[in-house]
A protein has these predicted regions:
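PLP-dependent class I/II
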Residues: 1-158
């Protein structure tokens, strides 16, 4: 019940949602297309890095987070997903949210990994100038994400 309540109370109220609709009535197509392009590139990068390192994860189809599952890789090392998150943060400085915060069994090592730690304005301005973005662009415009994913993988494989 607590998980459901937190999701209900942390949502925007109806008046705020209506205000957002009015704010977005102008043509936001260019902004949305480039935002999607950036988030698709980052999501694909995170997915590939985790998947090629034997970490179970579904390919993102939108949004700005993925839910990696470390259960097969590290299940015998941690009592709960919350314990895993604490140790990961202490040892690497990388923060994940435990799956138990989203209704998953606390013993399952499932997490929410958000990939939005980058300067969106700079990345968008660069994206407006490019037809295509590349993995190399992530090193320039999303270096914390690249570094964070690498830290997670190195830590999990030690």
């Amino acid at each position: 019940m607590q998980v459901l309540a937190s999701e209900a109370y942390s949502s925007a109220s109806a008046p705020i949602q209506y205000a957002a609709i009015a704010a977005y009535e102008s043509d936001q197509t260019k902004f949305l297309n480039h935002s999607k392009k950036i988030l698709n590139l980052i999501g694909e990068h995170c997915y590939k890095k985790l998947k090629t390192n034997n970490i179970e994860v579904l390919k993102p189809e939108g949004g700005f987070y993925i839910m990696p599952d470390f259960s097969t890789l590290l299940s015998n090392k941690f009592k709960s997903s919350a314990d895993f998150c604490k140790v990961l943060l202490d040892e690497t400085g990388v923060a994940l949210l435990p799956g138990s915060d989203f209704g998953f069994d606390s013993k399952k090592l499932i997490f929410r990994l958000s990939f939005v730690d980058f300067d969106g304005e700079k990345f968008l301005n660069y994206s407006y100038l490019k037809d295509e973005l590349s993995e190399e662009d992530l090193n320039i415009y999303a270096p914390k994400i690249v570094k964070g994913i690498n830290k997670i993988i190195d830590w999990a494989n030690k």
